[in-house]
Amino acid sequence: IPAPLQTFIDYIYRAGVTFSYNENGPVGLVPDKKVIILNARGGVYSTPEMAPSEMSVNYVRMIMNFFGITDIEEVIIEGHAQYPDRAQQIIADGMEDVKTIASRLAKVTV
C-alpha cells in the first residue's frame, strides 16, 4: 500500500480508540463507520491463481474489520498495465464505479 495510507493506518490503530481488548480478545470500537477502498493495480489479482498474492485490499479490509468496520465497499481497477489495449476502457469503467459510489455518498444525510 502507499506509504501515506500506511502512515494513516498507523495513526488510527490505537488501543482504546479504534479497538480494545476484553476477555475474548480484540473488539473493534468504530463499527458505525463506512469505508470505501479504491485500488488500482496494473495486473489482475482477482483470479483464483493470483488472489493469494493480493496484499493491499485484503490488508486494508482486515484492518478495518479489526476496528469493527464491516460496511466496506471496493472499487478495484485492475489489468490496465497487463492489457494495454484495453487500458482506457478498464480505467473508464472503474471511474464510473467511483462516480456511482460518490453520488450515493452525496445523498447521505447526517
What label would you give each PLM region?
Residues 1-60:
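Helix-loop-strand module that forms the ligand-binding subsite of alpha/beta enzymes
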Residues 47-110:
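Glycine-rich phosphate/pyrophosphate-binding loop and the adjoining helix
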